[in-house]
A protein has these predicted regions:
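Glycine-rich beta-strand-centered segment in the early N-terminal region that forms part
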Residues: 23-37, 51-104, 131, 150-151
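Mid-domain Rossmann-like dinucleotide-binding core that forms the NAD(H)/NADP(H) cofactor-binding site
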Residues: 136-137, 150-234
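Local beta-strand N-terminus motif with an aromatic residue
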Residues: 181, 226, 252-253, 343
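Glycine-rich phosphate-binding loop and adjacent beta-alpha segment
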Residues: 205, 222, 227, 262-325, ...
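Short amphipathic alpha-helix with an adjacent loop that forms part of the alpha/beta core around
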Residues: 237-249
Length: 363
């Protein structure tokens, strides 16, 4: 049996479509036929050679939902349900070792020293080869955390849980205060930013403000009920800051969430906060040029600045549950549905910020 795959062979080059033999499934592993695969902003960073974790060649794609085709042994999901052929599942993109200092002692597996990530640091040359979701089939290894999905779930919408959803949930773990009545500003209108904005709204934030440069993403934000959308390129930094201070009676935002993926957003984000506010850096996933930061502004305002790195099973599970309850909102985030053969065109749309969430639904 063969699988169609899209392989990155060289940085800054289009993905190459191939047909390859499906190898023997490792013990405890699953062969899964993709039903839907998400295209993520970090896929662009990978293609541009900005992520030092990435080996070549590689099948990209770390967000996926699919149907179990083959099981080598017994496999249970995170809820203890034994999996069978034909089950629909979603999987946690990161596979942790369960043995390192961060897994066993600190008990923060998202910091695992040996974390393997489908579609990010798993080479196409590494057995069992089919280790990314830009593929007709993917092979999930024994320690992969999966959740069996209901037949009623919108599978295309559910792919959002696998990366941006789980990472946003992780970020909200650091908010000690109740958001009821608060103002939350989200920098960046991609899936990570939109998921964060939706979480803030459903946790009681009075004002949710989204700063984004994409007209398409503004349309999506309005559909999901964001209170104020500021189009970045229509206002100067000073004007954007004033807009936030105007809706907070001159005090600034309680929480600001960086979801742009760019260091340049951080200096503005700190200025948007009230005294004692919290800044969550969620979108920075690759090394970038250094930027100047006024640490006096941080200390004199007694700010909490928290980095957020990926997610683990706890966040993944919550993201799946949240989407199950609010499918109608997250469905609005999907602006393009494409075939695997159209992946390079889809990546171009994403790079040009002409798309919200892109989902591959035809393989």
């Amino acid at each position: 049996m063969k699988a169609k795959v899209a392989v990155l062979e060289e940085f800054n080059k289009p993905l190459v479509l191939k047909s390859v033999e499906i190898p023997e499934i490792p013990s405890g592993g699953l062969l899964v036929k993709l039903v839907a695969s998400g295209v993520c902003g970090s896929d662009l960073h990978i293609i541009e050679g900005k992520d030092p974790r990435v080996p070549l060649p590689i099948i990209l794609g770390h967000e996926g939902v699919g149907e179990v085709v083959e099981i080598n042994g017994e496999k249970k999901d995170l809820n203890g349900v034994s999996l069978r052929k034909g089950d629909l599942i979603i999987w946690n993109r990161g596979v942790v070792c369960e043995e390192c200092f961060y897994c066993k002692v600190i008990k923060e597996p998202f910091l695992c020293e040996n974390r393997k990530v489908y579609g990010i640091n798993r080479s196409f040359s590494e057995y069992p080869y089919l280790l990314g979701a830009f593929s007709e089939y993917i092979i999930l290894e024994e320690k992969t955390e999966v959740i069996k999905l209901s037949l009623k779930v919108d599978l295309e919408t559910m792919v959002i849980a696998g990366c941006s959803g789980a990472t946003a949930v992780h970020a909200f773990d650091y908010l000690k205060d109740n958001l009821l009545g608060s103002t939350v500003v989200v920098q960046g209108g991609g899936p990570l930013g939109l998921f964060s904005a939706a979480l803030a709204k459903y946790q009681g934030a009075k004002n949710v403000v989204l700063i984004t440069g994409s007209l398409k993403r503004i349309e999506v934000a309005q559909k999901i009920g964001i209170d104020l959308v500021i189009k970045r390129d229509e206002f100067t930094e000073e004007e954007r800051i004033k807009k936030v201070y105007d809706v907070t009676y001159g005090k600034g935002a309680d929480v600001v969430i960086e979801a742009t993926g760019f260091n340049s957003a951080i200096t503005e984000g700190i200025k948007l906060l009230r005294k004692g506010g919290t800044y969550l850096i969620v979108g920075i996933a690759t090394p970038q040029d250094k930027i100047p930061i006024d640490f006096y502004d941080i200390s004199s305002k007694n700010l909490n600045v928290q980095g957020v790195w990926v997610s683990d099973a706890r966040h993944f599970r919550k993201a799946v549950t949240f989407i199950e309850k609010h499918e109608d909102i997250f469905r609005e985030m999907i602006t393009h549905r494409i075939s695997l053969e159209e992946i390079n065109e889809g990546l171009k749309l994403l790079k040009e910020k002409k798309a919200g969430k892109i989902v591959i639904n035809r393989f």
